[in-house]
């Protein structure tokens, strides 16, 4: 039955995730494991940010900074898994520094506070989706991510017609 299949798949994924975490905490290799590789990416990004807090490494030097930091840390990640931060906020701080990260956060959150009184369900749904994406991916580092964000952010911010929300809900 379909319910048993879904339940068993959820249990399998949960067991795999728990094994991944336990293996990683015990000093195991994170290579090929989505969740624990992100821990490695984030730790590496934080180390880079500590060394280049004010100005970052520059947008062109991000791959080199990560490669160098993985080598310095003797990371157990296989070379093909030594990726960037997979977090938009860390990506901004690595490339441009903490002051730019603060500006990015202000610019990102400003429309939310400005627009919250209008009660736009669609805008807030879009914004939360984009924000959550930025926590686990460097969303704005790809053409698809930039296009998605700019298109829908502009659409919902400049479209002052509340009928869209009323008709949607």
In which residue ranges do the predicted regions lie?
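Hydrophobic transmembrane alpha-helices and their immediate junctions
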Residues: 74-75, 81, 95-128
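Flexible juxtamembrane loops connecting transmembrane helices in multi-pass membrane enzymes
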Residues: 1-40
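Long extracytoplasmic/lumenal interhelical loops at the membrane interface
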Residues: 27-51, 55-96
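Transmembrane alpha-helices of multi-pass inner-membrane enzymes
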Residues: 107, 124-131, 140-169
